[in-house]
Amino acid sequence: TAEIEALGSYVSSTYPPVTTTPLAYVPQAIGISLARLLGLNTVCLLYFGRFCNLLFFVAMLYWSMKRIPFGKEVLFGVAVLPMTLHLAASFSYDVMILACMFLLTAVCLDLAYEKAQVRVRDIVLLAVLAAVAGPCKMVYAPMLGLCLLIPMQKFGKVRNWFISAFAVGIAWGMAMYLVNSQVIATYAAATEADS
């Protein structure tokens, strides 16, 4: 970087920017669209987008707190941390990730410790949460390990457990690939060229 600064010129990268799923911006887009329909000014567009992001976060937090069998205080405590609140009332796509991870945690704990049986809609919900949050930040992938807390007996048959685990895993993997395939291909090609 010292060399670049000394030359005083800009350098362009051949690598594409890391992308994220457009779903992460839906709450903000709804707020902006609503403000535009009302004919409001630019500042109101900004605040409506942020407010809708906050409303989405609060709704998902409420759903998570209703679903989690224990630890409601801990979940709420994490949700009202200053940085979490700052993100919740911003345009950041981290709100979608946090909300999905809160709900994923709540659903996994509910299925592991409260519910007598795992239903198909529970697996679909876990797969959707994994697919939406997965491409945003790969660092949250270990959170899918919470699914392993759910006892096999609650699936009825071992075969159902394997199908469910495969469905959640493939939803996460396909979402990661579809959203980030261009970035992965570019970096893989660069690595091969460097070898």
Regions found by a protein language model. Name each.
Residues 90-97:
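Short acidic/glycine- and proline-prone juxtamembrane loop motifs at membrane-interface regions
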